[in-house]
Regions:
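Short beta-strand immediately N-terminal to the catalytic nucleophile in serine-hydrolase-like folds
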Residues: 1-2, 27
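Gly/Ala-rich beta-loop-alpha elbow adjacent to hydrolase catalytic centers
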Residues: 2, 6, 10
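Flexible "cap/lid" loop of the alpha/beta hydrolase fold
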Residues: 11-16, 20-52, 56
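Conserved alpha/beta-hydrolase catalytic His-Asp/Glu region
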Residues: 34-40, 51-108
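Short beta-strand/loop motif that positions the catalytic acidic residue
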Residues: 109, 115-117, 121
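Conserved alpha/beta-hydrolase "acid-adjacent" motif
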Residues: 122-128
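Active-site-adjacent alpha-helix of alpha/beta-hydrolase-fold enzymes
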Residues: 130-139
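Catalytic active-site module of serine/aspartate enzymes centered on a nucleophile-bearing elbow/loop
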Residues: 139-168
């Protein structure tokens, strides 16, 4: 199970050891780290991180993960978690995302796969998740209406039921 950058990581893990993965869950993610139509480019995020600092960047980006932005119930959880990183680690994470491309590997993923996406996601657009769904042969896309990037926090009951039903 992987969310956002974690979704890239689980795709890579499946590439390296797919025979050890029974089922794969990718949510709020796509096949490319350098996300087209993201709320801002990765380079813009890196530049703003250097200028605005970690605290402001974590707050600003976490707002994009929720439909209700900083008024969302679990916004503070995400904003505070982002502020626990170092400036260097945050920049390295952005570079890693920018440079990762798993598109060519999707045809090799044979594992039963659940793809979850919030239709208000500003990081990963519909094309990204449609590509996952089309290129992974045994996949199913579930769209959460009225949710953004953090569907697991915006509609946790439905998210947990969806994951549980897929795993059982």
């Amino acid at each position: 199970l992987g969310h956002s950058m974690g979704g890239m990581i689980v795709q890579e893990m499946t590439k390296l050891a797919g025979d050890k993965v029974e089922k794969l869950i990718c949510y709020g993610t796509g096949p490319r780290g350098n996300m087209p139509e993201r709320f801002e480019t990765i380079d813009q995020s890196r530049d703003r991180l250097k200028i605005e600092g970690l605290t402001n960047t974590a707050h600003r980006i976490a707002k994009t993960w929720f439909v209700k932005e900083d008024k969302a119930k679990h916004f503070d959880l995400c904003s505070k978690a982002g502020k626990l990183a170092t400036l260097e680690a945050a920049d390295f994470a952005l570079v890693a995302m920018k440079n990762w491309d798993g598109l060519e590997n999707l045809k090799n993923i044979k594992n039963k796969t659940l793809i979850i996406w919030g239709n208000k996601d500003r990081a990963y657009n519909r094309n990204q998740v449609d590509t996952l769904n089309e290129k992974i042969t045994d996949s199913n896309l579930i769209i959460f209406e009225g949710c953004s990037h953090n569907v697991h926090l915006e509609n946790s009951d439905k998210f947990n039921k969806t994951v549980r039903d897929f795993l059982l």
